[in-house]
Amino acid sequence: MSEIGSYHDTIFALSSGRLPSGVAVIRISGPKTRFVYETIRQAIPEPRHAALLTFRSRNGDAIDRGLTLFFPAPHSFTGEDCAEFHLHGGKAVVEKMLAVLGELPGCRIAEAGEFTRRAFANGKMDLTIAEGLADLIAAETEGQRRLAMQVASGNQRKLYSEWRQRLINARAFIEAELDFADESDVPGSVSMQVWQQLSALKHEIEHHIASGKRAAMLRDGLHVVIVGAPNAGKSSLLNFLAGRDVAIISEEAGTTRDLLEVKLDLGGIPVYVTDTAGLRETDSVVEKIGIERARARMAEADLVLSLEDMSGPVSVTVEKIEAETWLIGTKADLGGSASGLWKYHISTMTGSGLEQLLDALQAFAEAKIGQIEDAVPTRQRHINLLRATIEEIEKAIEGDDLPLELRAENMRLASQFLGRITGDVDVEEILDVIFSQFCIGK
């Protein structure tokens, strides 16, 4: 992000999305927000009350007629003077309004995430809440929305702040024992009690990290891979799951050469299903590449659906992979073996067994995700810093042969790592990465 550290500029951007639209919302934030009202020949409206006005250029020409809202500092999203202009969502209208604002001294178009970054800088939110807002905007399923809302509501911040305060309090006891060991009002040897408290905290953080694996699955989605020999019905199954023709279906073996992926919403959980090249020996260079990609995707899968044509001879061979594998018998309408090898029998021609398979996929996804707690680490950044926190706590607990001064320093570092998650300490180098994930206007 360019030079915005001082926040002397007043920023503006279209916040309401793609044009044309019924209504377009332009957001403004910064010290010259009041000057903007003066420039468009309008009085500043009563705070947080919608006012109808005519938006004008600097020479007095009418641009549009619409609503405006004014939010004076510090009681605004960014903590600065803010305004919203609600105009008709025509492209020419919005472009003219943005051009007028861009001509004003000290005003410029906002960069991606800059409104939220200013809110963070002004203490209106911490980094976990900002990340939760980014996830809320990106959420495509109900489960993702719920998870993002939990984070954006401040549940993570509350938990991490509590843990950090416990570390600070424990460190204070140790330093009190160091500095005032001869004073009568300092309990004798409180350190044993402190180590017990730290051990309990360590176990809490470990449990918290474990819950983050499920949250990551919900945020990033589960991955299901369809494999099998050529003409086993893989593409037909993918088309059924997608509800449209995604893959080409042909009697010619080896039609699918590359990976084809569709995204499903199963009970609010995002599930990515990938169709792969048929697994067989081949002299085709292109087909070999497709088969290698299929094997690579299998290695990353949460679930593998191994398909085999039931109308032919039973010859189930499943490659050794870590993911759970379901054996699916296809083309059930053509008869053939009713072998107990198959977990499910399906026919994309008659629809037999397909709804049962879809229900099973949803049940699998729900079991994988489980019950998401109120506060969970949703990003790898959180987990890395939580693990660093545990490492410092372990050093403090296990350092029986070390001076108390060094063990107190381990506790200080542990609290610092927790502070980095919320942005309370030393996070300048990651701010650009976090806020660049937002769209312009947020």
Swiss-Prot record:
(6S)-5-formyl-5,6,7,8-tetrahydrofolate binds at R27, E84, K124, K442. Pfam families: MMR_HSR1, MnmE_helical, TrmE_N. GTP binds at residues 231-236, 250-256, 275-278. Its EC number is 3.6.-.-. Its cofactor is K(+). It is found in: Cytoplasm. Binds 1 potassium ion per subunit. It is an enzyme of class 3 (hydrolase). Its main location: cytoplasm. InterPro entries: G_TrmE, GTP-bd, GTP-bd_TrmE_N, GTPase_MnmE, MnmE_dom2, MnmE_helical, P-loop_NTPase, Small_GTP-bd. Exhibits a very high intrinsic GTPase hydrolysis rate. Involved in the addition of a carboxymethylaminomethyl (cmnm) group at the wobble position (U34) of certain tRNAs, forming tRNA-cmnm(5)s(2)U34. Belongs to the TRAFAC class TrmE-Era-EngA-EngB-Septin-like GTPase superfamily. TrmE GTPase family. This is tRNA modification GTPase MnmE. It comes from Brucella ovis (strain ATCC 25840 / 63/290 / NCTC 10512).
